[in-house]
From Swiss-Prot:
This is NAD kinase. GO terms for cellular component: cytoplasm. It holds the Pfam family NAD_kinase_C. GO terms for molecular function: ATP binding; metal ion binding; NAD binding; NAD+ kinase activity. It comes from Aliivibrio fischeri (strain ATCC 700601 / ES114). Keywords: ATP-binding, Cytoplasm, Kinase, NAD, NADP, Nucleotide-binding, Transferase. Its main location: cytoplasm. Belongs to the NAD kinase family. The active site is at D77. NAD(+) binds at D77, G78, N151, E152, H162, R179, D181, T192, A193, Y194, S195, L196, S197, Q252. PANTHER family: NAD KINASE. Involved in the regulation of the intracellular balance of NAD and NADP, and is a key enzyme in the biosynthesis of NADP. Catalyzes specifically the phosphorylation on 2'-hydroxyl of the adenosine moiety of NAD to yield NADP. It catalyses: NAD(+) + ATP = ADP + NADP(+) + H(+). It is found in: Cytoplasm.
Length: 297
């Protein structure tokens, strides 16, 4: 029975059986929640790693999105990206427990999750919505493939690194043509990921904006460009490109692109509902993860 006084009633634990420490974290959170009489469901990918948990507690990610009102993602930012592309379709809040490297998207310490997570369960948290991008590959006027990205959509060569040629249109207005190793189209969330490595700007996560970052352009005048989030970006791939290219979504999903194709990138109607502990500060995260200097006085 649902407790209307609780901020959340059905909680899903999501992740992959990466290593023994991650499995230990999944199990600790599961028992800690069940001891408080929460209904707890788990990612089906954890079934074999957690044989002591009843089989009916496990389900696939789409079903967890339907059934749960809070998802706890255990792992690094990669796990959060994969979960975000699915869970953004549902009315579910998401928080992360960091078992990865940088952890821009995963707030909770796996060894000390109890106190901050208890505060979140009590309704004491910060909530924000992050948008995703949709990527479509068009060929001869038809959509051949599509997917979504929480961080970035990247146009790049296939198996062999080489220059590629393409034109960029924004809302069907020609912006520029380019010969480069590719192009990164990033959300504000992704501005601290691959885009940052490519020299792109850091965008505050609440900005409704998209950054367009060239990858090793064959010109000295090319610079990153930030456009309004509602703009429709179209990449026209030159027929002169000799090999098949690729569009990568979050570095996890790859769509083949042929010479002469068009790639359409636009804001998804879906939003991921991220929640953070009450003391969350985006600028503290930047200072901590990027090694910025502390206050002088």
């Amino acid at each position: 029975m649902m407790d209307m006084k609780r901020a959340f009633n059905v909680i899903a634990i999501i992740g992959k059986p990466r290593d023994p420490n991650a499995i230990k974290t999944h199990l600790s959170i599961y028992h800690w929640l069940t001891d408080q009489n929460y209904t707890v469901l788990l990612d089906d990918r954890l079934r074999e790693a957690l044989p002591e948990i009843p089989a009916d507690r496990f389900n696939h990610l789409l079903k967890l999105g339907e059934l749960a009102d809070l998802a706890i993602v255990v792992g690094g930012d990669g796990n959060m990206l994969g979960a975000a592309r699915v869970l953004s379709r549902f009315d579910i809040s998401v928080i992360g427990v960091n078992r990865g490297n940088l952890g821009f998207l995963t707030d909770l310490d796996p060894d000390n999750f109890e106190e901050p997570l208890q505060a979140v369960l009590n309704g004491d948290f910060v909530k924000e919505e992050r948008f995703l991008l949709e990527a479509e590959v068009h060929r001869h006027g038809q959509v051949k493939s599509h997917n979504s990205a929480f961080n970035e959509v990247v146009l790049h060569p296939g198996q062999v690194a080489h220059m590629i040629e393409f034109e960029v249109y924004i809302d069907d207005t020609f912006a520029f043509s380019q010969r480069s190793d590719g192009l990164i189209i990033s959300t504000p969330t992704g501005s601290t990921a691959y885009s940052l490595s490519g020299g792109g700007p850091i965008l505050s996560p609440n900005l409704n904006a998209i950054s367009i970052v060239p990858m090793f352009p064959h010109t000295l005048s090319s610079r990153p460009l930030v456009v309004e989030g509602k703009r429709h970006i179209k990449l026209c791939i030159s027929p002169e490109n000799r090999t098949t290219l690729e569009v990568s979504c979050d570095g996890q999903v790859s769509l083949p692109v042929s010479p002469g194709d068009e790639v359409h990138i636009f804001q998804s109607p879906s939003r991921l509902k991220l929640i953070h502990p009450k003391d969350y500060s985006y600028y503290h995260i930047l200072r901590n993860k990027l090694g910025w200097s502390s206050k002088l006085f």
